[in-house]
């Protein structure tokens, strides 16, 4: 097993803390809480911490550049640790997945997600692993207000179960590789018992 940069995308500040667009930050916060890890070291234009799993150290990164400039932070971390882009795992919200689903994917486009766009612009390509946290699409209205809006209380109540499912996926990915994790988890809805 080798080191990874696990970057959760979001916007800094209490105003954005519980918004749909901060699913990546919320994911890393849940991991840090459950694993008793601190993500508070100021580095790489973000907040960083270390998580050890199966005798391997992984860097947890919450860019503090705002979403549209997340690529700068991810690039700095990869360069510092001399890791290829394939060792980056980016956790982000995804409008195209229904709430309650989490999927793994390697490569692809940015799908209009400004954080992914920034990473691809900074690094020249999109060949990194994505852990996509489904937030669903708004029934009406524009997507900007939707992603920057807070989750309703009924979704907030369910969020830990979804994030815990995503953590299971991440652990499987790190322990047994992407194909195995995708085959076991990509068709699962974490709201179903």
From Swiss-Prot:
This is Peptidyl-tRNA hydrolase. It is an enzyme of class 3 (hydrolase). Monomer. The keyword Nucleotidyltransferase does not apply. HAMAP family: Pept_tRNA_hydro_bact. Its main location: cytoplasm. PROSITE patterns: PEPT_TRNA_HYDROL_1 (PS01195), PEPT_TRNA_HYDROL_2 (PS01196). Its EC number is 3.1.1.29. Hydrolyzes ribosome-free peptidyl-tRNAs (with 1 or more amino acids incorporated), which drop off the ribosome during protein synthesis, or as a result of ribosome stalling. The keyword Metal-binding does not apply. It holds the Pfam family Pept_tRNA_hydro.
């Amino acid at each position: 097993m080798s080191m990874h940069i696990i970057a959760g995308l979001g916007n800094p500040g209490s105003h954005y803390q519980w918004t749909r667009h901060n699913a990546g930050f919320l994911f890393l916060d849940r991991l840090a809480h459950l694993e008793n890890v601190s993500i508070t070291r100021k580095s790489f234009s973000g907040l960083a911490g270390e998580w050890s799993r199966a005798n391997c150290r992984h860097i947890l990164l919450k860019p503090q550049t705002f979403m549209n400039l997340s690529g700068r932070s991810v690039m700095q971390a990869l360069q510092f640790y001399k890791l290829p882009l394939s060792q980056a795992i980016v956790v982000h919200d995804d409008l195209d997945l229904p709430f309650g689903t989490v999927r793994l994917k390697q490569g692809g486009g940015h799908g209009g997600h400004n954080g992914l766009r920034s990473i691809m612009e900074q690094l020249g390509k999109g060949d990194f692993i994505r852990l996509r946290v489904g937030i669903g699409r708004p029934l009406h209205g524009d997507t900007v207000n939707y992603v920057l809006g807070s989750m309703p209380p009924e979704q907030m109540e369910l969020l830990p179960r979804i994030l815990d499912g995503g953590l299971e996926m991440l652990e499987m990915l790190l322990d047994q590789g992407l194909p195995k994790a995708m085959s076991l988890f990509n068709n699962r809805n974490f709201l179903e018992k």
